[in-house]
């Protein structure tokens, strides 16, 4: 699997404004609480919520939510859960294309 990312303009994580995020695979996540469905499963979140289709759920802002290959919800904990792991993700076993 080939993943590529292009990081756009990023707002200050300490502010409430959330700007463009990043694009992964064929999906793009733009703005606050938007879903990117690229690279298997996307991520939803704030300033730099990353969702990679490799079972990774990364939350770099502490306020965004990101979902990996099988659910997980970072919320304000600053942690996204990927892989076959838990969290509060609404879907497991398919592409997470919704909040």
UniProtKB/Swiss-Prot annotation:
InterPro entries named among the record's database cross-references: HssA/B-like_chaperone, HssA/B-related
Region of interest: Disordered: 1-29
GO biological process, one term: sorocarp development
Similarity comment: Belongs to the hssA/B family.
PANTHER family per the UniProt record, alphabetical: HSSA/B-LIKE PROTEIN 1-RELATED-RELATED, HSSA_B-LIKE PROTEIN 1-RELATED
The protein's name in its UniProt record: HssA/B-like protein 41
Organism of provenance: Dictyostelium discoideum
